[in-house]
Amino acid sequence: MTQSFTGRKRVRKVFGHIPQIAEMPNLIEVQKYSYDQFLQVDEPTGGREEQGLQAVFKSVFPISDFSESSTLEFVNYEFETPKYDVEECQQRGMTFAAPLKVTLRLIVFEVDEDTGAKSVKDIKEQDVYMGDMPLMTENGTFVINGTERVIVSQMHRSPGVFFDHDKGKTHSSGKLLFAARVIPYRGSWLDFEFDAKDIVFVRIDRRRKLPVTTLLYALGLDSEEILSTFYNSVTFTKVKQGWRVPFNADRYRGAKPERDLIDAKTGKVVVEAGRKVTPRLAKKLAEEGLKELLVQDEDIHTRYLAQEIVNMETGEIFAEAGDEITPELLEALVEAGHTDIITLDIDHVNTGAFIRNTLAVDKCTNREQALIDIYRVMRPGEPPTADTAEALFKSLFFDAERYDLSAVGRVKMNMRLDLDVSDTVRVLRKEDILAVIKTLVGLRDGKGEIDDIDNLGNRRVRSVGELMENQYRVGLLRMERAIKERMSSVDIDTVMPHDLINAKPAAAAVREFFGSSQLSQFMDQTNPLSEITHKRRLSALGPGGLTRERAGFEVRDVHPTHYGRICPIETPEGPNIGLINSLATFARVNKYGFIESPYRRVKGGKLADDIVYLSAMEESRYRIAQANVAIGKKGEIEGELVNCRIDGDFEMVPPDQVDFVDVSPKQIVSVAAALIPFLENDDANRALMGSNMQRQAVPLIRSEAPLVGTGMEEVVARDSGAAIGARRTGVVDQVDATRIVIRATEEVDSSKSGVDIYNLRKFQRSNQNTCINQRPLVRVGDQVKKGDIIADGPSTELGDLALGRNVLVAFMPWNGYNFEDSILISERIVRDDVFTSIHIEEFEVMARDTKLGPEEITRDIPNVGEEALKNLDEAGIVYIGAEVNPGDILCGKITPKGESPMTPEEKLLRAIFGEKASDVRDTSLRLPPGVQGTVVEVRVFNRHGIDKDERAMAIEREEIERLAKDRDDEFGILDRNVYGRLSEILLGKQIASGPKGMEADAKVTQANLDDLSHGQWWQIALKNEKAQSEIEALKKQYDESKERLEARFADKVDKLQRGDELPPGVMKMVKVFVAVKRKLQTGDKMAGRHGNKGVISRIVPMEDMPYLDDGQPVDIVLNPLGVPSRMNVGQILETHLGWACAGLGKKIEVALDAYHRENKPKELKDLVKQIYGDDPTVASLDEEQLVEMAGNLTNGVPIATPVFDGAREPEIVEMLELAGLDRSGQVTLHDGRTGEPFDRKVTVGYIYMLKLHHLVDDKIHARSIGPYSLVTQQPLGGKAQFGGQRFGEMEVWALEAYGAAYTLQEMLTVKSDDVAGRTKVYEAIVRGDDTFEAGIPESFNVLVKEMRSLGLNVELLTPAAN
């Protein structure tokens, strides 16, 4: 395995015992693949596949007008380049999208009025703009109106047919009522159900139920065909002694005959009455040659006729098919000479008379009546005619426009009903409906099993592409109606396709989906893990899905088929538990939308190398062993018996019967759960909290990768896009804090430039106001390979995910300060900024054009002193770098206010002094309470045609300089590459002609070239034709590249200098970004990775913290009582292992010092070999690399303990002993205040702690006087509204209990909603008086008004009125 650039700098010691064979799929593949399949941006030569956008257009077009004299056809579509790139869209608050151009063809026909024959009269083709289609960014997100959003994948019930029963809940007898439901992808649902009397009914779209035979009549069957479809027949033949009937062994199996069974041939009794016919006995009788039985009239009574019986002479009908044979009917038939009677084979044991009984209750007898009945149910109140009824029934299930099973639905139907129909047949067929009814009746007869709807074989995933496809289809169908009307109303000969199309509905559908769909969510961008988890989320909610209230326990529960597909651990706590899930690490979604999990194939008890992805349906047939089965040297499975899963159960089977083996132990869990070391030692509830809380970890100023990791850290950092990977192999040419320039050495061709420029994101704001900042890891001259990490992002360190910090923890009580999960921390942590994070707040102000005149952004603000303006520039906008506090002005703005009518005196004064300041008011943007920090960025946006102020010009100049620098660097590297290549071609070749001073026939030397300028090199012509043509090709490529770079630069500058697109009425907009530094403080929430969370209760001076024997104080003190009841023992194992890692780090530091003193590498090499064993990466390092790596290990040796395959206890003990520490993992601590050792040893070690996004600064809030609600006049609630604290019902009881009458009165009146009282109190306080009277609370008036609106008059009667 080749190690990456960062991987060599710090190698993780891996404790996993199971080798990883399969490569983990890219973690955001779900999103990217799905949307790529939808857009199919680059059209291949053979044309696009019938899927995604192509399929939508194909399904809606061609559109014909009502008279079919013209048709609008779809030819193809293409995307133009987006107007702005991702970064520009984020800054300008725009959507990152590409214009969609569709080529349409309008064909006009000439219709011959006599014959009705059509001939083509005119064909017009044209490209039509159909709105913008949002594009996905590199990282699987969408930029919509400037913010990053994620479209969450939806889990829904797969189309197809499902069989179920009501679990005995419907009827009081507890009888199981079976039902079947055919669910299409779009179209009407078809339900079949039994009622308590065993009659089969059908419902269409959950409307009123009809007997199922009505539907069968409508399908074109008559009553005899219906019976023959569902039942076999038995013929009774009249003989002297009674009736002869064929003996069928299957029919009598398990039956108890009421009368003796007599062999018709011999007349002997073969089975006595009441004796059970066992399967063995039935088989024996058949083998002994029993062919026919002799039965009496009583055996024929209560049977049903299979065919109608007609009196041949008179033509009258004796009996209908399905009629019951009564003694009278039998007698009449025998008298009329009918010797053979064909009956239905219904024995009420193996076959019930359900369909026959349904036929009997059905009032319909033919197709017309049935169609009209169905019409009446579907369209109640409309008068039916035969034609409309026929058309409606056709359109319900047999019309591809209105009914679509989808390929998935057809595949599922085929599997469930054992059909063999191509998946292009997407409507129902008569045979499908009959097969469904047969299967349902079979279930009632006790044959077969019902379906489990929570099985992942019956649930599928709809990802971005598919959701978008459905949405776009809705938009196009709305458009189709308008097009049809327009085609009929205009002169079709003169119009072009463009005139017929209004693309607004399609564009609106897209906008609505991305802007307001329940599945389009504001991306959780707290840290890289939360981004990745959000993109891999599966939600059962959303349009067409479940609702929280209706979802029962079964849907939310973990199902055996979740294994390797959906994580059983990661799901939210609260009302959404189990409805929102996460994809497992190795899982992928197949083309039908089912989740697949990978397995290694086993052939004859030996592991093969190929890896197979299986869906839940396929997997149920195989025996699958776990990843930890013992495997021999040659890949054979060891042991007599192996524990296997098969169809949700466990079996012990010999190795040669095993079909597959799991790929990896971590394929069960999701990414977040796979980041928890010793997950196997944590209780599931706590693991759930642990995986959820990692997503809330705030990126810190100094990230630090965990000492005890799981090996997943690198994968998450790479796939999330937080850390930057090299796009091509090359050499680092330039590096500074804001960008990296790499000269590519591979994959260089004429179409691409040979330079990769990576602009790093510096102190940008994320969706959650955390800080996104990238730092380069490479130096000039470093060789990097494709995919190597060249820059760290937020929460990553050396290419590893780093959500928190490793801190020294002691498990012990400390003066009650860690009661109830509180956390005690040392002042060192605050002093050294261990858990300090930067948060970036965005503030914006708009200058609008109002009725009274335009607002103005200016420094000239009325009634504001110079002190308040000290941070503003001449344009009235705050400087970058200014330290701002609550209430400070960030951007000055004045708004014109309405003129109040003036007295003549005022008018005179105004005329004399020209006083103008009074007619504007100060509406400046001020920093809200609770925020203080440094201004890090200012952006100014101007409307087209409005002059830019000085500040906007300065920002623009800076930006253009940056662009020019990028362009010049690319030019520089291009020149070096091209002229290097040119000199290689020229040197040593014969000259044909050249600039002055070069002789013909001479050879080109380096001296010749040095004398000429680069531009003159091109003038040299060579005699060698091949070399000359190479030079010409090179020159062409060089000129094209330069042109391309210049054009790109000009385009970007043009965009900058053009005005911005602002909302209507806005003249100018200013955004100010303030960076707030948040140190760790009392009240902040912290957590480990094992669900061990707590709030900081106190920050203790370093000298008072408990300290080790060598005087080192611990950083954090946790309560040991938080472990036993919570059963998350993983944190203790992590503590011990972290302690060992740090101990080894100290040993390496000592060896490194010795190396630097004496320059002897042997001791260092031996120690590293002792720690890492035979790790190939470590073995491949040279001395310089080894020393660099050792320098990175002095704070501790990082280790990986993969989930379910981690370090065992003996290995932890071995590590402790290797580090020279006590094997118990406990040490003697001393009390920091007295210096005394504590009574007994304490568990001490390193734990990876995270600071969570619940910061006390964001929550603490105080109000003096603030805004009131309009109607009730009570103070608003919540920090965002600067609200007050609600004094609720229970608080009132408390004051009542104490008899605090005056306090209570104040609370309910003057401190709340007594408007007059509030003013009086204020006046009293101003006067220095402390008496006041409370009036009537406004809420009482509201109550009175509400009662009056109900027609109840409420008045206050005074004694005087009486």
Curated annotation (Swiss-Prot):
According to its UniProt entry, this protein's organism is Parvibaculum lavamentivorans (strain DS-1 / DSM 13023 / NCIMB 13966)
Q: What does this protein do?
A: DNA-dependent RNA polymerase catalyzes the transcription of DNA into RNA using the four ribonucleoside triphosphates as substrates.
Which top-rank group of organisms is this from?
Bacteria
| Record-listed E.C. numbers | 2.7.7.6
The protein's matches in InterPro entries, at most eight in alphabetical order, are given as: DNA-dir_RNA_pol_bsu_ext_1_sf, DNA-dir_RNA_pol_bsu_external_1, DNA-dir_RNA_pol_su2, DNA-dir_RNAP_su2_dom, DNA-dir_RNAP_su2_hyb_sf, RNA_pol_bsu_bac, RNA_pol_bsu_CS, RNA_pol_bsu_protrusion
Q: Which classification does the entry list for the species?
A: Bacteria, Pseudomonadati, Pseudomonadota, Alphaproteobacteria, Hyphomicrobiales
GO terms of molecular function:
DNA binding; DNA-directed RNA polymerase activity; ribonucleoside binding
Biological process terms in GO annotation:
DNA-templated transcription
What are the entry keywords? DNA-directed RNA polymerase, Nucleotidyltransferase, Transcription, Transferase
What name is this protein filed under? Answer: DNA-directed RNA polymerase subunit beta
Q: Which family does it belong to?
A: Belongs to the RNA polymerase beta chain family.
- Which NCBIfam families does this one have? PRK00405.1 (NF001616), rpoB (TIGR02013)
Instruction: Please give the subunit comment from the record.
Output: The RNAP catalytic core consists of 2 alpha, 1 beta, 1 beta' and 1 omega subunit. When a sigma factor is associated with the core the holoenzyme is formed, which can initiate transcription.
Coiled-coil positions: none
Which transformation does this protein catalyse, written as a reaction? RNA(n) + a ribonucleoside 5'-triphosphate = RNA(n+1) + diphosphate
Q: Which GO terms describe its cellular component?
A: DNA-directed RNA polymerase complex
